[in-house]
A protein has these predicted regions:
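Extracytosolic ligand-binding ectodomains
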Residues: 1-368
Length: 368
């Protein structure tokens, strides 16, 4: 059973934007090592069952190269399940280009809601949480704490706007309120002081919490302790919703973290690593429990309610039929501690409590 793994060689998401100052604003590690931890488990199982698990990795400069590589894998190497560490547009185009091929792609790093909505594809499964899941998890916690009035500081990037749009949807869903959205800039120009000074950005109104939408990681690190009012900071800084935190210490998480660090020193496991790990674990379970390595049989099991993936976060995971998003808890963490695990117990659902996070079936814009 051979799997594939594709990525862009010059993926801008992994560019070191703080290279001049020597400061790393975001985690630059690619999630490939997460898949290797799960592959070690698969190989151990394979030695008992007689199934050999392996993985081919390809880094290309363009989506067209990736599409050709996967097409070659399908015909020459019998590879039909491929982990994709790609930005949203590249993943969308790849899925469309391979629509007529026997292939299932696993999105292990793109949170964009559009990939689970208008741009969804029947040949993509999402193990990385959607933006909607992340914002729902955080908003559940804010409402539970009684922090209903949210001041939003929004950065200039499209990713920042997407985060804010998702937060606003979550606020409506859980009856919180964004009292105002104020744009900030990353500049030293004194003429833009009102958009660079945290004291000015957070002054002149009342709020319970400050939400920072800063995909760059450069501005948000300064907001905590600099707000005009003494208020908690959440979003891209402070309390952050994430698929994984190295400080999660329940549900056998410590063992997983130690195995990852042994394989990939000195990095610690991040959310995309977890998503890559989960993708390989899902395929392994589907192969073992379906008793087959045939594409149709493994795909059918992955999409069935028989899949009970150990997420190492408590609740077992499965893929939603309406948008192929993996159901999984979301961790709310600081730099060195997990404060809460969502969904919170007071939020209920008629079929699965994990569906309180993200887009539920009646809301979906996905049409396969």
């Amino acid at each position: 059973m051979k799997l594939g793994y594709v990525e862009l060689a010059d993926d801008p998401r992994y560019a070191n934007r703080g290279a001049r100052s020597g400061i790393v604003f975001t985690d630059l590690g690619r999630p490939y090592q997460g898949s290797q931890v799960a592959l070690e488990d698969a190989r151990a199982i394979g030695r008992v069952t007689g199934i050999e698990f392996s993985m081919e990795r390809s880094a290309s400069k363009s989506g067209d190269e990736l599409m050709q590589r996967i097409s070659d894998w399908i015909t020459s190497d019998d590879i039909h399940f491929v982990l994709a560490d790609l930005p949203a547009r590249a993943l969308r185009d790849l899925a469309r280009g391979l629509a007529e091929h026997p292939i299932m792609l696993f999105n292990v790093s793109a949170p964009d809601d559009s990939l689970r909505g208008a741009d969804c594809a029947n040949n993509v499964l999402h193990t990385y949480p959607s933006e909607a899941m992340l914002s729902d998890a955080l908003t559940q916690y804010l409402v539970a704490k009684g922090w209903l009035q949210i001041l939003v500081l929004q950065g200039p990037a499209p990713e920042d706007a997407a985060m804010v749009a998702s937060l606003q949807r979550s606020a409506r869903k859980f009856h919180a309120k964004t009292v105002e959205t104020r744009p900030f800039l990353l500049t030293n120009d004194p003429r833009n002081r009102e958009q660079t000074s945290i004291a000015l950005l957070t002054g002149g109104l009342r709020y319970d919490v400050v939400y920072v939408a800063d995909s760059s990681g450069e501005f948000g690190r300064y907001v905590t302790y600099e707000t005009s009012l003494p208020r908690p900071v959440v979003g891209s800084a402070g309390l952050v919703p994430t698929a994984w935190s190295w400080s999660w210490d329940r549900d056998a998480a410590v063992q997983l973290q130690h195995r990852y660090e042994k394989l990939s020193p000195p990095r610690r496991m991040n959310g995309a690593d977890w998503a890559a790990w989960a993708a390989v674990k899902a395929v392994t379970q589907a192969v073992m429990r379906s008793g087959s390595i045939a594409f149709d049989a493994v795909k059918a099991f992955l999409l069935s309610d028989k899949l009970t993936l150990d997420t190492v976060k408590g609740n077992p995971g499965s893929f939603r039929a309406w948008d192929h998003q993996l159901r999984a808890p979301v961790l709310l963490s600081t730099a060195d501690a997990v404060i809460e695990r969502a969904p919170l117990p007071q939020y209920l659902h008629q079929t699965n409590v994990l569906d309180t996070l993200g887009i539920d079936a009646p809301e979906t814009a996905c049409r396969f």
